[in-house]
């Protein structure tokens, strides 16, 4: 354990010295993954889906605030949707506008949360998000997480319905537009995932803030258990087809990531816990002191 603590101290010193470069590298990798995922799934406009465009956007967004990357990703999605169907692009603009209003109202300055949520779902590890957000954030982080889930499913819907939306006739376009709008608004799988994410974030955050030993580990396991149980119940009672491999593997990975986060952000020695009692003129105080 002592050797791990030494490595943690070394890592923290290294990060303190080179944090600017580390963050920019991570921002570039996030942009590369994000724009690459969008272009590989809905690359209807060939110019915008090229490797040069993907890399160029990632490089440009590396040196700008993360909110710019969020807008760039939304713009790239809309461009691809427009290349497929203008009505779909207009509906998407309205949905993105509504999500931005909610984001700006509840979590300004946290645009990276939306991006991470989209990436996690795109990489088929959705249930890492509730554990990470519940441990590091507050219940308000449900808003950007939900926006990320909706954004991912919008891309997935269009990818799956591309052939219908490519119809040249007016009737085909109208039918495709109605189908897309219905999928976004009434998709049971999407809203189930939003609900799972919200409930799990609340559970993880509630457990993490309790004054119990190993609260972070318990919170991670509790959040993963909630994800597995609710997702399995959704498959059973709503007749959904969420992959059980994705459910289990992403939940297990969420627990593993939670343990790593605890090591770096909340590493304490529970074996040396002390319970202290003292008083003043008005109150008795019972304090549980856990050394770092």
Label each residue range with its predicted role.
Residues 146-151, 225-230, 247-266:
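Alpha-helical membrane-embedded segments
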Residues 120-121, 129-240:
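Generic multipass alpha-helical transmembrane bundles of integral membrane proteins
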Residues 162, 209-210, 240-244, 260-277:
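Juxtamembrane/interface segments at transmembrane-helix termini
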Residues 38-50, 80-94, 186-195:
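Structural signature of hydrophobic alpha-helical transmembrane segments
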Residues 20-74, 80-81:
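Hydrophobic transmembrane alpha-helices
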Residues 1-17:
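Short, Lys/Arg-rich, polar N-terminal cytosolic tail immediately upstream
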Residues 51, 59, 72-146:
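Membrane-interface helix-loop-helix junctions at boundaries between adjacent transmembrane segments
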Residues 268-292:
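Short, highly charged, low-complexity non-transmembrane loops/tails of multi-pass membrane proteins
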């Amino acid at each position: 354990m002592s050797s791990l603590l030494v490595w943690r101290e070394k890592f923290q010193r290294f990060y303190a010295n080179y944090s600017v470069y580390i963050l920019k590298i991570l921002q570039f990798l996030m942009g590369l993954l994000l724009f690459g995922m969008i272009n590989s799934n809905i690359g209807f406009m060939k110019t915008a889906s090229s490797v040069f465009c993907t890399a160029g956007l990632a490089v440009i967004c590396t040196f700008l605030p993360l909110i710019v990357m969020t807008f760039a990703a939304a713009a790239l999605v809309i461009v691809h949707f427009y290349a497929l169907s203008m009505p779909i692009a207009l509906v998407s603009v309205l949905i993105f506008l509504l999500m931005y209003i909610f984001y700006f109202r509840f979590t300004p300055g946290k645009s990276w949360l939306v991006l991470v949520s989209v990436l996690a779902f795109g990489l088929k590890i959705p249930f890492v998000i509730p554990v990470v957000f519940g441990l590091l954030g507050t219940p308000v982080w449900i808003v950007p997480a939900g926006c990320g889930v909706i954004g991912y499913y919008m891309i997935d819907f269009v990818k799956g319905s591309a052939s219908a939306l490519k119809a040249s006739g007016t009737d085909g376009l109208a039918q495709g537009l109605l189908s897309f709008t219905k999928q976004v608004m009434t998709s049971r799988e999407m809203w189930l995932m939003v609900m799972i994410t919200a409930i799990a974030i609340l559970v993880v955050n509630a457990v993490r803030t309790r004054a119990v030993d190993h609260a972070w580990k318990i919170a991670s396991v509790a959040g993963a258990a909630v994800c597995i149980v609710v997702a399995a119940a959704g498959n059973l009672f709503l007749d959904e087809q969420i992959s059980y491999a994705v459910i289990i593997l992403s939940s297990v990975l969420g627990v593993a990531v939670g343990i790593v986060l605890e090591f770096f952000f909340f590493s304490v020695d529970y074996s040396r816990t002390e319970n202290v009692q003292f008083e003043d003129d008005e109150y008795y105080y019972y304090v549980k002191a856990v050394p770092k």
